Amino acid sequence: MFQGQIDQDAATPVEANAIPDVLFERGLYWASGRSGVVNLVAAHKWFNLAALKGRADAIALRREVAEMMSEVEIAMAQREARTWLTTH
């Protein structure tokens, strides 16, 4: 039985032409703590990317996550989303 940890960002790279559903699912993954850790910065980033790709319901979830974040954390998430867009 596997007893290690899987780095989700390395294990499931998302291509630039990925469907919005995949990006949305990544937001849900980090917002819900499915990995055992809630990461609001990552959740905001993926919801933001899903919204940019046309997933309308990602906007509401991004807003909900942002309400639990500091301005610094939101800026970090936005920076990470911009970086992802430029590298993919």
Question: Positions of the model-derived regions?
Answer:
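Terminal, low-structured helical/coil segments at or just beyond the last alpha-helical repeat
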Residues: 2-9, 13-16, 20, 63-88
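Generic signature of intrinsically disordered, low-complexity segments enriched in small/polar residues
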Residues: 5, 27, 32-33, 47-50, ...
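Residue-level detector of alpha-helix boundaries and kinks
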Residues: 11-12, 28, 50, 62
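Short helix-capping/linker turns of helical repeat alpha-solenoids
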Residues: 16-23, 32-34, 39, 47, ...
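Hydrophobic face of amphipathic alpha-helices that form TPR/SEL1-like repeat modules
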Residues: 23-32, 63-66
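Alpha-solenoid helical repeat scaffolds
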Residues: 41, 45-48, 63, 82
